[in-house]
Amino acid sequence: GVQFHPEVTHSVDGEKMFSNFLDICGFERGWNMGDYAEQLMEKVRKQAAGQKVFLLVSGGVDSTVAFELLNKALGPDRVLGLHIDNGLMRASESAGVMDFMKEQGFDNLRIADASELFLSRLKGVWEPEKKRKIIGDTFLDVQAEETARLGLNPDEWLLAQGTIYPDTIESGGTKNS
């Protein structure tokens, strides 16, 4: 198979191809990230409609950007993040995530050390799909346990997900993601 990525810098005339495509489609130029971010924040405000939002934050790009966006849109008093240490990351990575988020000014992020639970459930499991299911189920179990421990009333709190659309497809569509 062949893949072609006109968006990367080393593609000859990639920008020109995009420009021609946009011209053919009659697309109006003028899009900018600032306007898009504001549109997303307005959408978040409408969907949250006075409720608070809870989000699992891995420290990766997707969930970190979602956490930042939620905080900007709703304010930190209406957003709570939870980082789950699953014991499967690099040494001290969870501490690094928490330190980074603190440096960025986020005081509304908690951590749950569930490493022993994850590792005990994965012990002796060799098949990748079984591991994936166990990890996913354990994240859900820890999330449920932590939301109960934190006293998050489902009538007052929404659950947000920081992911990109292709990940929802990979995990079987939006039903399982």
Where are these regions (language model features)?
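RNA-binding accessory domains that recognize and position tRNA/RNA substrates
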Residues: 1-157, 163-177
